[in-house]
Amino acid sequence: MDPNIWGPKFWFSLHSVSFTYPFSPDAKDQERYKTFFEILEHLLPCVLCRKNYSKNIQKYPIDGHLDSRKSLAYWVMDIHNMVNMENGKPTMTREEMLESFERQYGRKIYLDDPSPHITKKKLDDIAWQTENGKLALFLSLIHI
């Protein structure tokens, strides 16, 4: 199967998976995601892609990158850039990649947990912005 057809969509999906990884994953989360990313070397729909992915994850293993969302997201970005370099395609900085995904999703993507930065004053300000304070608070929290 031609990776020029399925590859960009597949990378988009892998990045999206990393952006929804827990901020503070437990051991079970870490094991599930590790299994997911490692099993890909056997499932990619292109023999050469499978070989190259296997080589890349041996060179740059996922171990040590499962302690946080940011760490996993950066690992996926770095693996993606390694593949792009091998294929003579342009690479992007981590910041450029994140901005690209934020534009595509139309919202901020948090790699660090934003909740410690939510103050009581911010919550009060949000609640006063509408007659239905609870709805405003709920909507603001799900879009953080």
Predicted regions and their residues:
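Conserved small/polar residues in nucleotide/adenosyl-binding loops
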Residues: 142-144
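Short alpha-helical scaffolding segments that buttress acidic/His motifs in well-ordered protein cores
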Residues: 11-18, 37-40, 53
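Amphipathic alpha-helical segments that form the core helices of the histone-fold
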Residues: 34-43, 57-63
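Glycine-rich loop/turn
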Residues: 20-41
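Short, thiol/selenol-centered motifs that function as redox-active sites or metal-ligating centers
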Residues: 46-49
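Short terminal alpha-helical segments
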Residues: 1-25
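Domain-level detector for trafficking modules
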Residues: 66-116
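Long, His/Glu/Asp-enriched segments that create or flank divalent metal/ion-associated functional microenvironments
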Residues: 121-129, 135-139
